[in-house]
Amino acid sequence: MRISHTLLNASSKFRTVFDFGERQVAHWFPGHMAKGLKQMRASPRKVDCVIEIHDARIPFSGRNPLFQENLDVRPHLLILNKMDLADTSDKMSILKQLERDGVKNVLLTDCLKQRDTSVKKIIPLVTDLIENAPRFHREENRSYCLMVIGVPNVGKSSLINAIRRTNLKKGKASRVGGEPGITKAVLTKIQVCERPVIHLLDTPGVLPPKIENIETGMKLALCGTILDHLVGEDIIADYLLFSLNRPQRFGYVERYDLETPSDDIQHVLKCIAVKLGKTQRVKAITGVGDITVRMPNYTAAAYDFIRAFRKGELGKVMLD
């Protein structure tokens, strides 16, 4: 949205650094993920190519180092999914940085889109990577096996379904959900292509037990790879406001009927609660006894603010 010079001048006083205080990011490594990682480590011998999928809004943050121990033994393709939610105006700089980090094969996708042209490129690219790998032995009627890995809620199951939809014209094979960790067990082989015959394994996303720093953890939480209540909707909402104000993404002002951009999360949440009618009854103690008053429901407002961001309703953002 367009913002006047007066408003831009006001925003120049906003925070340039986010104060995390003494907060600690949740240690989130459920049992099924540890089991999945153990099985994943035992699988590369059966796998011809590893497809790593990650959120395009955080192309560098949170890529799991535990995965990378397993990537060197087989060809590797990085898919940055949810590109419809990401500001990719600086795409070339991102690709160059990834190449410096040793990642040469990258595709940007929107796997929920019914006809994403990038999804059509996956099987030809993977086939080429496998057949040109040093360890490849050509055999008649050979079938290939792929493994999809990534942190929670980046679209692994959506990717599998998109590949099947594109190459087999078949329906869903993997359950899809908006919460991290919905794929609870390493699945058996799922066929995704007939020519050549390609099967694919789906694994649980495995978030590393130790996150590099608190800001990396907050970016992961904002993108929904950590269950909200483990971090706190209030802190996620505040970090979201900070992340929108920094690049002057002020779409929330018009959406929630604010007069100007704000750096005060309590003020923003109050405006959201009023706009959406999110209130709650609370008891107030007065000189004449207890009375019940209606107050803004800040938790419900924070939830709507975060949900709107994750659905792309506050504009495209690059967090890294």
From Swiss-Prot:
Gene3D superfamilies registered for this protein in UniProt: 1.10.1580.10, P-loop containing nucleotide triphosphate hydrolases (3.40.50.300)
Record membrane topology: Peripheral membrane protein
Domain CP-type G: 37-209
Cellular compartments annotated: Mitochondrion inner membrane
Entry's Gene Ontology cellular component terms: mitochondrial inner membrane; mitochondrial matrix; mitochondrial ribosome
PROSITE patterns according to UniProt: G_CP (PS51721)
Alphabetized UniProt keyword annotations: GTP-binding, Membrane, Mitochondrion, Mitochondrion inner membrane, Nucleotide-binding, Transit peptide, Translation regulation
Mitochondrion as UniProt keyword: yes
Principal location: mitochondrion
Cross-referenced Pfam families: MMR_HSR1
GO molecular function: GTP binding; GTPase activity
Binding site for GTP: 81-84, 153-158, 205
UniProt-listed CDD domains: YlqF
GO biological process: mitochondrial translation; regulation of translation
SUPFAM superfamilies in the record: P-loop containing nucleoside triphosphate hydrolases (SSF52540)
Protein task: Plays a role in the regulation of the mitochondrial ribosome assembly and of translational activity. Displays mitochondrial GTPase activity.
UniProt similarity note: Belongs to the TRAFAC class YlqF/YawG GTPase family. MTG1 subfamily.
Entry protein name: Mitochondrial ribosome-associated GTPase 1
The organism of origin for this protein: Ictalurus punctatus
Organism phylogeny: Eukaryota, Metazoa, Chordata, Craniata, Vertebrata
